[in-house]
């Protein structure tokens, strides 16, 4: 249902106010949808920004006065004022006393404002951030926030900062139950599609031309292991260390099980490492996020049995990071390319070309395999 509409053409005239040249012809067609989840002030902002992008509005063209806009759209003057002030603060429009608001000249020196909303800090997130920041350079101001996999925090940050940033880059890692996922989608839909980039996890139920750079938890583990299928088949067993509390436990286990079944490899899943599961001639894939503790327990148990990693038994870790190049003379990993993830997200912002890209996933061979 359309609540109000504005189709306004002002008299053609060019005026000079100091250094400001203003063209008083301004074709503008706005429609406010009453039942939209997007509030009216945000609808005004979105439509003016879209008119600038598609060339309907150009630098120097006047906007209607607040009173004219409010009357034509059937809104309060305060609603229109809120839209104009936000657009002015963002550098989209300017104002001159006694004249009104007009479309600002493009400011090539203005830095883009980017919110990085991660679930938690980790070595992997640091790799993503470093790559993102080095690619985007001095062209953006970046602020990091954490939602800690809590929907309430996601909602809080989106509500509070929706009008403060040009781009929102979000890792949507939340519990996978249907209720939580519906809440997440509802919150994310408040963000204008053109400002949104989803990282690390693809949201199939979120439609639109937003950007996403993701890994596929349902297939990637099998893809990585397939790169060493010939070496894995002769070994006695693949031991997978993965906690049942892991967010994507079911996806990873299914992917690994499918690989082992297809390649006739014996596979056993464990929630942690104990000395009784450590044997010569076997492989240990550590999927748990707390790699350090599992790795320490595995190496301790192996040393007690005079077993050397890479020689008497093999170790593969899930997810790569710089420290894994050094541990045990190099820890073999299967991993998404997190540097690529950060770089591609930054390039989407720099080029203003959101798209959907699956990151490369590979095995990085080092000393433990």
Go through each PLM region and give its residues.
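Periplasmic-binding protein-like
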Residues: 115-116, 165-176, 197, 238-243, ...
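An alpha-beta-alpha
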Residues: 220-261, 357-369
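Amphipathic helical "hinge" segments at domain boundaries
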Residues: 42, 66, 89, 101, ...
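N-terminal helix-turn-helix
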Residues: 58-95
């Amino acid at each position: 249902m359309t609540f109000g509409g504005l189709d306004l053409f002002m008299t053609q005239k060019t005026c000079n106010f100091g250094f400001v040249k203003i063209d008083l012809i301004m074709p503008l067609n706005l429609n406010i949808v009453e039942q939209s989840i997007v509030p009216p002030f945000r609808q005004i902002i979105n439509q003016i920004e879209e008119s600038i992008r598609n060339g309907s509005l150009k630098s120097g063209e006047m906007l209607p006065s607040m009173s004219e806009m409010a009357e034509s759209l059937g809104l309060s003057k305060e609603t229109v004022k809120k839209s104009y002030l936000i657009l002015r603060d963002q550098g989209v429009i300017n104002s001159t006393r006694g004249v009104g608001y007009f479309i600002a000249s493009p400011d090539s020196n203005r830095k883009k404002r980017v919110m990085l909303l991660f679930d938690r800090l980790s070595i992997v997130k640091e790799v993503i951030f470093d790559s993102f920041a080095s690619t985007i350079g001095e062209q953006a101001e970046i602020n990091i926030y954490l939602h800690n996999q809590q929907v309430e925090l996601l909602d809080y940050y989106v509500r509070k900062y929706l009008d403060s940033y040009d781009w929102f880059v979000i890792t949507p890692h939340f519990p996978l139950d249907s209720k939580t996922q519906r809440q997440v989608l509802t919150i994310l839909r408040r963000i204008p599609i053109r400002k949104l980039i989803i990282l690390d996890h693809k949201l199939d139920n979120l439609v639109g031309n937003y950007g996403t750079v993701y890994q596929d938890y349902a297939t990637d583990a099998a893809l990585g292991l397939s790169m060493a299928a010939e070496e894995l088949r002769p070994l006695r067993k693949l031991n997978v260390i993965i906690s049942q509390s892991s967010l994507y436990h079911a996806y990873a286990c299914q992917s690994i099980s499918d690989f082992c079944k297809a390649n006739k490899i014996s596979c056993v899943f464990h929630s942690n490492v104990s000395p009784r599961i450590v044997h010569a001639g076997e492989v240990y894939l550590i999927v748990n996020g707390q790699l350090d503790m599992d790795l320490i327990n595995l190496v301790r148990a192996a040393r007690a049995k005079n077993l050397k990693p890479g020689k008497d038994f093999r170790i593969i870790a899930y997810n790569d990071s710089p420290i894994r190049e050094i541990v045990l003379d190099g820890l073999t990993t299967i991993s998404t390319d997190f540097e690529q993830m950060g770089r591609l997200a930054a390039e989407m912002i720099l080029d203003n070309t959101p798209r959907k890209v699956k990151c490369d996933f590979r095995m990085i061979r080092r000393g433990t395999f």
